[in-house]
């Protein structure tokens, strides 16, 4: 069984989603199925088929969440230290062309959200950063072409 690295925050988020799907969404869907059944003929009952599809999607996600939680390797980022970039690090970069600063935290695949500065450990930029230190330059092949960055800060917060 492959372990899935994630932060404590990411683990808590998965557990909350699982709780919501099991304790709130599942009963709501069951009620919708029951309500749709009461309308009679199921073969042409769009509400019934929509509710059954929602049930299938919800149960699939519940199974996925249970698997992820079982395989989770929760890493307490605040207990990490050092100068090298690794999982959990918050890294400040400067774009070598535009001088624009960007801050990213390297997190597990399930936690990634680029808009909030959380990038997946398996993303091209994170793979380029792993093992590097402050002052190192990296080059990332992005869809818009190669981009160069300098690492100006590495912290574990």
From Swiss-Prot:
Residues spanning the signal sequence = none
Q: Which GO terms describe its molecular function?
A: DNA binding; RNA polymerase binding
Answer whether the UniProt record assigns the keyword Ubl conjugation to this protein: no
What is this protein's name? Transcription elongation factor GreA
Query: What keywords are assigned to this protein?
Result: DNA-binding, Transcription, Transcription regulation
| Annotated family | Belongs to the GreA/GreB family.
Q: Which NCBIfam families match?
A: greA, PRK00226.1-2, PRK00226.1-4, PRK00226.1-5
Task: Please name the Pfam families in this protein's record.
Answer: GreA_GreB, GreA_GreB_N
| PROSITE patterns membership | GREAB_1, GREAB_2
Entry-linked InterPro entries: GreA/GreB_C_sf (IPR036953), TF_GreA/GreB_CS (IPR018151), Tscrpt_elong_fac_GreA (IPR006359), Tscrpt_elong_fac_GreA/B (IPR028624), Tscrpt_elong_fac_GreA/B_C (IPR001437), Tscrpt_elong_fac_GreA/B_fam (IPR023459), Tscrpt_elong_fac_GreA/B_N (IPR022691), Tscrpt_elong_fac_GreA/B_N_sf (IPR036805)
Q: What does this protein do?
A: Necessary for efficient RNA polymerase transcription elongation past template-encoded arresting sites. The arresting sites in DNA have the property of trapping a certain fraction of elongating RNA polymerases that pass through, resulting in locked ternary complexes. Cleavage of the nascent transcript by cleavage factors such as GreA or GreB allows the resumption of elongation from the new 3'terminus. GreA releases sequences of 2 to 3 nucleotides.
Biological process terms from the Gene Ontology for this record are:
DNA-templated transcription elongation; regulation of DNA-templated transcription elongation
């Amino acid at each position: 069984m492959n372990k899935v690295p994630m932060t404590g925050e990411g683990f808590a988020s998965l557990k909350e989603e699982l709780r919501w799907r099991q304790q709130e969404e599942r009963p709501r869907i069951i009620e919708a199925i029951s309500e749709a059944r009461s309308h009679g003929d199921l073969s042409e009952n769009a509400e019934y088929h929509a509710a059954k599809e929602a049930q299938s999607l919800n149960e699939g996600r519940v199974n996925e969440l249970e698997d992820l939680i079982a395989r989770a390797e929760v890493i307490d980022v605040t207990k990490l230290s050092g100068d090298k970039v690794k999982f959990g690090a918050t890294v400040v970069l400067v774009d070598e062309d535009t001088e624009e600063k960007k801050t990213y935290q390297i997190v597990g695949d399930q936690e990634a959200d680029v808009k909030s500065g959380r990038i997946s450990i398996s993303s091209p930029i994170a793979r380029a950063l792993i093992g590097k230190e402050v002052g190192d330059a990296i080059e990332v092949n992005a869809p818009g072409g190669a981009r160069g960055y300098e690492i100006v800060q590495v912290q574990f917060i």
